[in-house]
């Protein structure tokens, strides 16, 4: 028995503003049913002694100390700029 109906697929497609044909709705129904069946297999797993986790991997942020360093020289920064004036990038005006 299918766990999702063609009407449900058409309804979700309508909510998503997707125009699908009857053939596409039938194809998506079969695909979604297979996905749901596969996902339901997870209910068969014994998770009794498995602690809840928020991440599968034990991840930690490894931070380094901020060390101030000199920036690039102004000439180096502006050398690839298409246009500059008074040590600043010059860009076309966007407001009138």
From Swiss-Prot:
Keywords from UniProt, A to Z, are: ATP-binding, Ligase, Nucleotide-binding, Protein biosynthesis
Q: What is its EC number?
A: 6.3.5.-
Q: One MF term from GO for this chain? A: glutaminyl-tRNA synthase (glutamine-hydrolyzing) activity
InterPro entries the UniProt entry points to: Asp/Glu-ADT_sf_sub_c, GatC
> What does the record list as coiled-coil region(s)?
none
Q: Which GO terms describe its biological process?
A: glutaminyl-tRNAGln biosynthesis via transamidation; regulation of translational fidelity; translation
Give the family, as the similarity comment puts it. Belongs to the GatC family.
Q: What does this protein do?
A: Allows the formation of correctly charged Asn-tRNA(Asn) or Gln-tRNA(Gln) through the transamidation of misacylated Asp-tRNA(Asn) or Glu-tRNA(Gln) in organisms which lack either or both of asparaginyl-tRNA or glutaminyl-tRNA synthetases. The reaction takes place in the presence of glutamine and ATP through an activated phospho-Asp-tRNA(Asn) or phospho-Glu-tRNA(Gln).
Name of the protein in its database record: Aspartyl/glutamyl-tRNA(Asn/Gln) amidotransferase subunit C
Species source reads Geobacillus sp. (strain WCH70)
